[in-house]
């Protein structure tokens, strides 16, 4: 993989590590909750871009019409990088968070972010390590 991929993957791993810190925080604090939502969105965006890089560079899949997150997720599912349903659900949450002006959306999804989505990011991280033969 190229240097751009390496930087993006490293950013994804760092963002995931920071997001995982949310598991140790008090969600009664609105600042913690909004920070968790923002970090989730950033981590998700880095993840789908890493997927796109892998699809192009490792699988030579270049038939994306627009290269949108939804298209990338569908292609990533086809080659077993991810489980489609969970990641499509994550995309929906990420899109909803974009328009969360009063904190209601992040409040509704914080439990899923911390309880499920972080683990899905870690699963993806392990898949990438295996495909790209990345050592810790």
Where does each model-flagged region fall?
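Solvent-exposed interaction patches of small proteins and small membrane subunits
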Residues: 1-136
